[in-house]
């Protein structure tokens, strides 16, 4: 693999400089397909959007799936490396945004290509079937399901083992972290639309202020983890988006909240999502907005 280092570094720098948003990974997907097709894999593109599935059969044996993600994030990169991302685009709402590989997917793709090269070059040392998949829209928590719904496990060999990784800045270079049980959390994206009755900021008594209600919801959500779940159960509820209002002196008629929810068990996930619904309903009733 040492001989592959220069070309893999070059690939990494290219991917880092040219990120694409979730479900828009057209060029990234094509590059992954190009890289792995050159190794003799049978490649299918546009699985579940811009997903890629590559199969390499090497006699009888187990089927192993190796997965990478593709998408970047709407984040502006501040850096001075020669391959800094200067990519800008429009998001799904039509807003102009910068794009960056801020979560390591450029590194994941490079590792994926490197692993494919190593395995394709050492077919005399293993038997079985490889299924290499490149998954779109990981950041939105929707790409894996899109590929499954598009027949991932029906159109292609079903794996006995699935392998994936996530880079971790907390680990020293050359160190691998492994654990029994969940290593990373599942993610849910939750959108909450808080309705109110807008009006003049100097006469709040004539309104139902959705900013106040939304603020109460944000604070109440933090009690789910601290007061409803077992103290050692790992849960994260983060409000990453709070949008509402257009002017200083106008109370708006709605506020949009955007959450990311991270859990490590199906049972806890259901509890958390139900608690979010209950809190929103209850605070809406308390604010005199039972249907909002």
Where are the regions that the model predicts?
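Short secondary-structure junctions
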Residues: 39-42, 228-236, 284-291
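Residue-level signal for inorganic ion chemistry
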Residues: 15, 147, 259
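A conserved active-site cap/scaffold subdomain adjacent to cofactor or substrate pockets
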Residues: 248-274, 291
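Histidine/acidic-residue-rich, glycine-tolerant segments that coordinate divalent metal ions
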Residues: 73-75, 81-100, 106-107, 119-252
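Acidic/His- and Gly-rich active-site-bordering loop/insert found
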Residues: 1-101, 106, 110-127
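Short Gly/Ser/Thr- and Asp/Glu-enriched loop/turn motifs at secondary-structure junctions
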Residues: 47-51, 234, 252-254
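A common structural junction motif
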Residues: 70-72, 224-225, 277-288
